[in-house]
Amino acid sequence: MYWRRAALVGTRLIPVRSSSAGRLEGPAGISGSGMGNSTSSSLGNAATAPVNQIQETISNNCVVIFSKTSCSYCTMAKNLFHDMNVNYKVVELDMLEYGSQFQDALHKMTGERTVPRIFVNGTFIGGATDTHRLHKEGKLLPLVHQCHLKNSKREEL
């Protein structure tokens, strides 16, 4: 499977393969509250490659925000999806034992190390500023709806 950063934001194709190895779960995993949003605070162990766990999380969720708890841009992005009444998965990198390895993997996947790193419908759309721009242009919600439509069709089969 190939994921690409949205053409709306513009950049290169990023090859990524889905893998069944490693899940974004761990003994200290917690669930967020409100609107079904969830947070991962622990992501397994170092033996499981961060890239595989990132890929699986992105594949299993329509909206994923890789964040840090102290990041104001991350809060801005989470608030945007909350205000849009869109469920999302949050992975707080600073709460993970191997958070720096996950951030390194995200850097290799997206070309940028900063947070937030936001994926919608398996597509990297950028950071908070990119996401807000897509929303103002009326392009963000259609991306989210595409994912929900795809998931609905998958459930019908």
Swiss-Prot record:
Listed Gene3D superfamilies: Glutaredoxin
Cellular compartments annotated: Mitochondrion
UniProt GO MF annotations: 2 iron, 2 sulfur cluster binding; metal ion binding; protein-disulfide reductase activity
Pfam short name (any one): Glutaredoxin
Residues found modified as Phosphoserine: 20
Chain residues that bind [2Fe-2S] cluster: 62, 147
Span of the transit peptide along the chain: 1-18
Binding-site list for glutathione: 68, 103, 115
Residues modified as S-glutathionyl cysteine: 71
Activity regulation information from UniProt: The 2Fe-2S present in the homodimer leads to inactivation of the enzyme. The 2Fe-2S may serve as a redox sensor: the presence of one-electron oxidants or reductants leading to the loss of the 2Fe-2S cluster, subsequent monomerization and activation of the enzyme.
Disulphide connectivity of cysteines: 71-74
Superkingdom of origin organism: Eukaryota
Chief place where the protein resides: mitochondrion
Protein keywords: 2Fe-2S, Disulfide bond, Electron transport, Glutathionylation, Iron, Iron-sulfur, Metal-binding, Mitochondrion, Phosphoprotein, Redox-active center, Transit peptide, Transport
Domain Glutaredoxin, residue spans: 51-151
InterPro entries reported for this sequence: Glutaredoxin, Glutaredoxin_euk/vir, Glutaredoxin_subgr, Thioredoxin-like_sf
A GO CC term attached to the entry: mitochondrion
Assembly and binders: Monomer; active form. Homodimer; inactive form. The homodimer is probably linked by 1 2Fe-2S cluster.
PANTHER family reported in the protein's UniProt record: GLUTAREDOXIN-2, MITOCHONDRIAL (PTHR46679:SF1), PTHR46679
Similarity comment text for this entry: Belongs to the glutaredoxin family.
Function statement: Glutathione-dependent oxidoreductase that facilitates the maintenance of mitochondrial redox homeostasis upon induction of apoptosis by oxidative stress. Involved in response to hydrogen peroxide and regulation of apoptosis caused by oxidative stress. Acts as a very efficient catalyst of monothiol reactions because of its high affinity for protein glutathione-mixed disulfides. Can receive electrons not only from glutathione (GSH), but also from thioredoxin reductase supporting both monothiol and dithiol reactions.
Protein name (Swiss-Prot/TrEMBL): Glutaredoxin-2, mitochondrial
Organism: Bos taurus (Bovine)
Chain's gene name: GLRX2
